[in-house]
Amino acid sequence: MPRKGSFSIKAKNYFLTYPQCSISKEEALSQLQNLTIPVNKKFIKICRELHENGEPHLHVLIQFEGKYNCTNNRLFDLVSPTRSTHFHPNIQGAKSSSDVKSYVEKDGDTIEWGLFQIDGRSARGGQQTVNDAAAEALNSGTKEAAMKIIKEKLPEKFLFQYHNLSCNLDRIFMKAPETWAPPFPLSSFTNVPDEMQEWADGYFGKSSAARPERPISIIIEGDSRRGKTMWARVLGPHNYLSGHLDFNPRVYSNEVEYNVIDDVAPQYLKLKHWKELLGAQRDWQSNCKYGKPVQIKGGIPSIVLCNPGEGSSYKAFLDKDENASLKNWTLKNAVFITITAPLYQEGTQASKEEGNQEETH
């Protein structure tokens, strides 16, 4: 037991206030880091503020690895590096480290060292409520910043509801997929077969209100370097699904006019969403790996691009006996086109770009 009137504070978190202190926050941090204390320091945060009269003062949060019993009220004194002036702080044990941290960083002129230590009292007490923390997380602007706030101020939810939090914040802070910018205009494609052009005009040549409820898709087969991919992608805003299907909201948008399905094996598509995509079906779900089901708005056609040959050709795949019923369905929902020549004039910009962009077609 300390003697009556003696100084003694035992705490893991210390809140220091230097009421008149001209030392920079960087110098203060250096001196506090170099204090010789039997308990390891884990985190230090310092804020420099100005009084109404312009005089500076410092607020400091120091966190230790375990409880530290401070019996020397001069321990945290700071010394001016240019003269012998000492700056003595008011010393308190901080019951809620999060509340103190929030107070220290409120004006923004701060510096910190180490990793902030979360404790149960921070989540329960002080002025911080669940609603306050949720509002702060929502206003943080990014998923990463929101998760940091929740981890610090609602650690129980962070630990036991992490998966749900992560999924929810993905949706809340979701950014629309970047719009693909075509490297050259649609007019570069001067050798488009009539049937392909009729299909494009029948859909893109109409307003959204005049388009059918479930528009017809198109399957285009042809050798590599014919211009299939570039033509398909220059028609308008679209989702580009290459090699596999990915409906993650970060890459797939419900606000486009069509899908481009490029180099996706027919065997794979049959196991996934053949009818939903080629049939322009509306309001269906797809399961994302490690995530919750994604709701697909649908109602848009697909342009399927493939090479000839076993494993690639959709026509050859559908001609197999075991796919007879799927073939009958597909013939009612898609147009088949086989191209034998480039869709552009040789030597045009499209020809050059195709060599870089379309290695497999």
UniProtKB/Swiss-Prot annotation:
Keywords from the named record: ATP-binding, Covalent protein-DNA linkage, DNA replication, DNA-binding, Endonuclease, Helicase, Host nucleus, Host-virus interaction, Hydrolase, Metal-binding, Multifunctional enzyme, Nuclease, Nucleotide-binding, Nucleotidyltransferase, Transferase
Stretch list, region Binding to RBR1: 143-153
Residue ranges of the motif RCR-3: 103-106
Single GO molecular function: DNA binding
RCR-1 (motif): residue ranges: 15-18
Pfam short name (any one): Gemini_AL1_M
Chief site of localization: host cell
PROSITE patterns to which the protein is assigned, alphabetical: CRESS_DNA_REP
Domain writeup: There are 3 rolling circle replication (RCR) motifs. RCR-2 is probably involved in metal coordination. RCR-3 is required for phosphodiester bond cleavage for initiation of RCR.
Similarity comment text for this entry: Belongs to the geminiviridae Rep protein family.
Protein's name in the database: Replication-associated protein
Source species of the chain: Potato yellow mosaic virus (isolate Venezuela) (PYMV)
